[in-house]
Amino acid sequence: MSLSQNAPKSKGIKREELKKQYEDVEDEEEIGSDDDLTRGKRRKTEKEKQKLEESELVEMKKLENLIFGSLYSPVTFGKEEEEDGSALFHVDRSAVRQIPDYEDDGDDDEELSDEENGQVVAIRKGEAAWEDEEEKQINVDIASVNRLRKLRKEENEGLISGSEYIARLRAHHAKLNPGTDWARPDSQIVDGESSDDDDTQDGGVDDILRTNEDLVVKSRGNKLCAGRLEYSKLVDANAADPSNGPINSVHFHQNAQLLLTAGLDRRLRFFQIDGKRNTKIQSIFLEDCPIRKAAFLPNGSQVIVSGRRKFFYSFDLEKAKFDKIGPLVGREEKSLEYFEVSQDSNTIAFVGNEGYILLVSTKTKELIGTLKMNGSVRSLAFSEDGKHLLSSGGDGQVYVWDLRTMKCLYKGVDEGSTCGTSLCSSLNGALFASGTDRGIVNIYKKSEFVGGKRKPIKTVDNLTSKIDFMKFNHDAQILAIVSTMNKNSVKLVHVPSLTVFSNWPPPNSTMHYPRCLDFSPGSGFMAMGNAAGKVLLYKLHHYQNA
């Protein structure tokens, strides 16, 4: 009885347990479905977020490419064959024209293409894609750092904003690296467009690249440095035909390529000077006149040749004709060996006897006047305009003559001189130098000397023997002093500082006994004749033009 009663009860219990398990399974399925839904939404959200980030990254790269330029751009060809999405190779786009945001290139719009997306984006030239607010909040002290002081616009300027600092850095970089016009065929440079007025006053910097001239050219206004002279020894000027006797004269033609040499071997030689071959052009033999002096007229039309004779020669370069002139009417001079020619090429002044100075016209070759000193005449020098003549001699005084009135304007004692032996005047007429028989050279300002001030601005006493020859170069920055009595007796004076060049004469070199010296019209060459019959040639590096 008990067994039958327990059986239905156990069945009911099992039924309830099965029902409960079924409900639990349904609950778990519902919970599982909810979890799947949540996971799906989360996954979808993450994908959308990832796409948004990728889109933002693409936009940022696009802006960076537009503003700063792309160093490379991946190629789309072949991407369908790649599984990892990486580019097979890159194309260099660095040569694409870039326009910095600080340049003002006009108001025209420019279209730049994005090769990855195939989009065309129009941007406005000169406008920044974005502005960094932090730049305005930062201050930079450009006065405290040495390398940043060049960015100052005013001397007392110190703190500037970050944006201003960046703008000045960019402007300074653009100034140092202006670029080239030929590399950008679509660019047009207009005068006055640059913010730096100094760079556009003499033309655009790109004009330099259109020529084959030297980029660094020394202007005529450059000052020669004192101390050491930069020079090079070249092939002897008369190496093609050396003289058999002492060289008494060397003189450059006004075109700077033609040099004459003359000496006691009675030959007048012409050389074309290039510093390498120095080709001989012509040699003329004067049978009856050992040459003491020869010189071109400043206009280059004639050569005046003289010796220890009563006559002199005139050689016409165009006609290649020699004329023998003299003796001069009314004069009894036995020698016309020393003379000077005026800068206007109109007058020749000869040293005469007993203190007389003989003035001869270069056109008629006739005597046009005489001047008389108290002592003997030893040296002469014309002023720059040919209107005045300086003379010195045995009485130790310097005379200044007016050739228009044939009268002496002023005479003064040459300080420390008992006998003047050499005179020379600068081409600008501001200075003249007087040499003596004791090796003393006094340099005067002509205006002060004529005004009564007899004190020289400099006395050079580096030589101990008689001064035979002196010469200013074309810009009066160098004064050459020559004494023929001793070997290597040549000094070069730096006139602006009134000091002697320490490296001249050249060490360990033999100049023999120097006799004469001349500078080319642009002072690029210096020629010096010696008693051995050679004409030494030097290149002065400071002067670019011969």
UniProtKB/Swiss-Prot annotation:
Residue spans of biased composition, Acidic residues class: 24-35, 101-117, 193-205
First and last residues of every WD repeat: 242-281, 372-411, 413-454, 509-545
Gene3D superfamilies listed in its UniProt record: YVTN repeat-like/Quinoprotein amine dehydrogenase
Biological process, per Gene Ontology: rRNA processing
Region described as Disordered: spans on this chain: 1-55, 94-118, 177-205
Record's keyword terms, sorted: Nucleus, Phosphoprotein, Repeat, rRNA processing, WD repeat
Main subcellular location of this protein, as a coarse class: nucleus
Comp. bias regions, Basic and acidic residues: 13-23, 45-55
Phosphoserine carried by residues: 33
Lineage: superkingdom: Eukaryota
One GO cellular component term: Cul4-RING E3 ubiquitin ligase complex
Localization: Nucleus, Nucleolus
UniProt cross-references to Pfam families, sorted A to Z: WD40
Short motif DWD box, span: 389-404
Classification via InterPro entries: Utp18 (IPR045161), WD40/YVTN_repeat-like_dom_sf (IPR015943), WD40_repeat_CS (IPR019775), WD40_repeat_dom_sf (IPR036322), WD40_rpt (IPR001680)
Function according to Swiss-Prot or TrEMBL: Involved in nucleolar processing of pre-18S ribosomal RNA.
PANTHER family hit by this protein: U3 SMALL NUCLEOLAR RNA-ASSOCIATED PROTEIN 18 HOMOLOG (PTHR18359:SF0), WD-REPEAT PROTEIN-RELATED (PTHR18359)
UniProt note: domains: The DWD box is required for interaction with DDB1A.
Membership in a protein family: Belongs to the WD repeat UTP18 family.
Entry protein name: U3 small nucleolar RNA-associated protein 18 homolog
Organism of this sequence: Arabidopsis thaliana
